Regions:
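Penicillin-recognizing serine hydrolase domain
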Residues: 1-126
């Protein structure tokens, strides 16, 4: 069962690509959005906040010096995360978009961080 429509999924998936390619309206606008969604992965920057885009999402399991830009979505019946991820050594630079519409995925707080770390490790092997 799809809780997020296909058009919305495509828009969420295109969002980080348009930012990376500076095509989100204009280069200046894209750079502005990138700064708005830039996330500090050091735990002291997010750990004590009641709502943050790191804990239980794609950034939680990544090294703290990773460049991380993310836009999350979370409702009562789904979670999604769209992120631009750059390793500290710049060997890995990729976009990861994950939708968790099934109950077992959107209720599992470990799924997104585990998946993210596995993708990160694989990207570093290239």
């Amino acid at each position: 069962m799809l809780f997020i429509g296909l058009k919305k999924r495509v828009k969420i998936g295109k969002f980080p690509i348009e930012i990376e390619q500076e095509q989100a309206i204009s280069p200046a606008y894209s750079q502005g959005i990138e700064q708005l969604i830039k996330r500090d992965l050091h735990p002291q920057a997010w750990k004590e906040k009641p709502f943050n885009p790191i804990q239980d999402f794609l950034g939680q399991s990544l090294p703290v010096k990773t460049q991380f830009y993310a836009k999350i979505g979370w409702t009562f019946n789904n979670r999604n995360d769209a992120a631009i991820i750059v390793s500290p050594d710049n060997k890995a630079h990729y976009i990861l978009v994950v939708f968790g519409d099934e109950k077992k995925f959107y209720q599992d707080k470990e799924f997104f961080p585990i998946l993210s770390r596995q993708v990160y490790n694989q990207m570093l092997k290239k």
